[in-house]
Amino acid sequence: MNPEFDYSKLNEKIIRTFLTRTAFCEAFGVSTSNLSLKMNNKHYFTQPQIAKACSLLKIPQSQVGKYFFTTKIKKI
């Protein structure tokens, strides 16, 4: 079973930096529907996409895990 990631901090960073997901998607080079699939764990971010997002959002290397690799806590 693949892990599900919690992208809530990434979403907050996108809104704080670009004001809208649409503006971020234009700079990032993906459609809003593609980003939505990634943020909802239907598709995964590739390593080059993570690097590009970090560059656009000015996320330091030491903080990448906080934005891209925090797993969701499953509720029972």
Where are these regions (language model features)?
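Short, Lys/Arg-enriched anionic-surface-contact patches
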Residues: 1-5, 32
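Short, charged recognition helix plus adjacent turn
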Residues: 3-4, 12, 17, 55, ...
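Short basic helix-loop element that most often maps to the first helix and adjoining turn
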Residues: 7-27
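The DNA-recognition helices of helix-turn-helix-type DNA-binding domains
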Residues: 31, 42-43, 71-72
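Short, basic-rich loop-to-helix N-cap that marks the start of a DNA-contacting helix
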Residues: 42-52
